From Swiss-Prot:
The lineage of its organism: Bacteria, Pseudomonadati, Pseudomonadota, Alphaproteobacteria, Rickettsiales. It comes from Rickettsia prowazekii (strain Madrid E). SUPFAM superfamilies: dUTPase-like (SSF51283). Catalyzes the deamination of dCTP to dUTP. GO terms for biological process: dUMP biosynthetic process; dUTP biosynthetic process. Signal peptide: none annotated. Keywords: Hydrolase, Nucleotide metabolism, Nucleotide-binding. This is dCTP deaminase. It catalyses: dCTP + H2O + H(+) = dUTP + NH4(+). Its EC number is 3.5.4.13. It is an enzyme of class 3 (hydrolase). InterPro entries: dCTP_deaminase, dUTPase-like_sf, dUTPase_trimeric.
Length: 188
């Protein structure tokens, strides 16, 4: 597997509609204000988080159970900036919609701006022929409230191209998160 360059990413966007909307260069300023960057980078794509968040709460004193997940664990917010409580967790989603080629696996890493503030983003791999908005998992590892800015860069996706096409893609095995739109909760 090889990591793919900005040139390959641009070609995949133009020929396979891999990312939409797509920013062909790094965007660092919006309306004359500095923002957390997003867009095409040398060997990846920095995606934005939308204004749709689900923040974990203990108001209802429920248990977080991945096999029987309750929406009572969360508070929904549509905001320009999401405040994550100390040592807590929130879900968001990318603005960008991804369509992954059959011979590509995508991994996500955090942005240093957030990581240096104790905010960690986690995403499981985007598998061959998966498509949808990516649900982003944000952890606030600090003892203080932490802020995530909507419509700004949140994470970077790295595209790994295989030298061999997989026998069965995510679409063919009818993965449960196929074509997800919005913040998607755990499914079993």
């Amino acid at each position: 597997m090889a990591i793919m360059s900005d040139k390959w990413i641009k070609d995949a966007v133009m020929n396979q509609n891999m990312i939409r909307p797509f920013a062909a260069k790094q965007v660092r300023v919006h309306n004359k204000e500095k923002i957390i960057s997003y867009g095409l980078s040398s060997y990846g794509y920095d995606a934005r988080v939308s204004n749709e968040f689900k923040i974990f709460t203990n108001i209802n004193s429920t248990t977080v159970d991945p096999k029987n997940f309750s929406e009572y664990n969360l508070v929904d917010r549509e905001v320009d900036a999401c405040i994550i409580p100390p040592n807590s967790f929130a879900l968001g989603r990318t603005i960008e919609y991804f369509k992954i080629p059959r011979d590509v696996l995508v991994i996500c890493v955090g942005k240093s701006t957030y990581a240096r503030c104790g905010i960690i983003v986690n995403v499981t791999p985007l598998e061959p022929e998966w498509e949808g908005h990516v649900t982003l998992e944000f952890s606030n590892t600090t003892p203080l409230p932490a802020k995530i800015y909507a419509n700004e860069g949140a994470c970077q996706f790295l595209f790994l191209k295989s030298d061999q096409i997989c026998d069965t893609s995510y679409a063919e095995r009818q993965g449960k998160y196929m074509k997800q739109v919005g913040v998607t909760l755990p499914l079993t």
